[in-house]
Amino acid sequence: MLVLALSLGASAVSSLISFVGSLTKPGGLKDQAATLNGSYAPGRPWLDLAWQMFGIATALVPVALVAHLLIREGAGLRTIGFDRTRPWSDLGRGTLVAAGIGSAGLAFYLVARASGFNLTVVPESLPEVWWKFPVLILSAAENSVVEEVIVVAYLLRRLDQLGWSPMASLVASSVLRGSYHLYQGIGGFIGNMVMGVVFVLLYRRWGRVGPLVVAHTLLDIGAFVGYALLAGKVDWLPTP
């Protein structure tokens, strides 16, 4: 599908190549680092900010393509529950999902890394500038919108139209989610695949992607901002 080729399908291939590189590199996986939000222009904060905003904006283009394709078939983003018709319900459900997944996900990562199945994930390595936290929050929101709209809502819709069974669609969506996180290691693949299963089941139940976007945004904000505040200050949080 064109949408996947332009977005997370390509990311999955890139992630696989990156994982092979990490796996064949001397030393263990946990001695290597995977940085999620890094500087594009070290020592040049305004240029760095411009690159950060450019990256966030262009990453959302496939979502605009999804909206266009849905409108062409007489639907729209409201069809997948990505609208403002039920904001408080979406916020409440998303917050509960994030609370349930967050602590379990962190514990799984720590165990996977300690066991040598995961790289050391560095959620952010941005300079200490005024725009650091706003950019991290925007990055979290961008990741969430792209992943949930494309890998859950749009992919499931297309697979349903192609006659795939609900189980086959669930497997396809969750394996794809795990695949584009494979650059983090085997733990990243398994953990995100499990999260994908949960998110697909919730989407099928609620018929709305809004709560999933909220949950994913809160999870990523917790990871990005939490790491920025705690890295090097607590013993249990791995750093390179």
State what each model feature region is.
Residues 10-12, 102-106, 110-240:
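Transmembrane helix-loop-helix hairpins at the membrane interface
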Residues 1-79, 224-240:
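N-terminal, membrane-interfacial amphipathic/helix-forming hydrophobic leader that caps
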Residues 2, 6, 50-58, 89-97, ...:
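Alpha-helical transmembrane segments of integral membrane proteins
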Residues 30-32, 44, 72, 78, ...:
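Arginine residue identity/basic-tract feature
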Residues 59-124, 174:
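A contiguous, well-structured "functional interface" segment within a domain
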Residues 1-8, 40-51, 75-106, 128, ...:
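Interfacial transmembrane-helix boundary/kink motif in multi-pass membrane proteins
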